[in-house]
Design a protein with these regions (language model features):
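Short, surface-exposed, charged amphipathic helix/loop patches that serve as local interaction elements
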Residues: 1-94
Length: 94
């Protein structure tokens, strides 16, 4: 999935017009890593497909960026990416 930002996004000195998400490259280890990261922050996702935090972290892994980048996006871009992450997760039977 290639997300085209509504407006270019600047983050840590880099300007992004698009961001590519490689959902099919995610592994079980990535999912466990996300859960562990959330637990370290005292966050828990009882239903990962409904957790904005879980989905943002999953999207970040799929795009090869930090979750802080995804979380810093404007709401319209964040929401679109979160929904794409949810669609992917549900399509896998998670």
């Amino acid at each position: 999935y290639v997300h085209t930002f509504r407006r270019p996004v600047k983050f840590e000195g880099t300007t992004y017009k698009t961001l590519t998400f490689y959902w099919d490259r995610l592994t079980g280890a990535d999912m466990i890593s996300i859960e562990n990261e959330m637990q370290d922050m005292n966050e828990y996702a009882l239903s990962p497909e409904m957790s904005a935090s879980f989905l943002a972290k999953m999207a970040a892994k799929a795009a090869g960026v930090g979750s802080d980048f995804i979380e810093a996006l404007p709401v319209p871009d964040f929401t679109k990416i979160r929904n794409e992450a949810r669609s992917f997760l549900v399509s896998t039977g998670y």
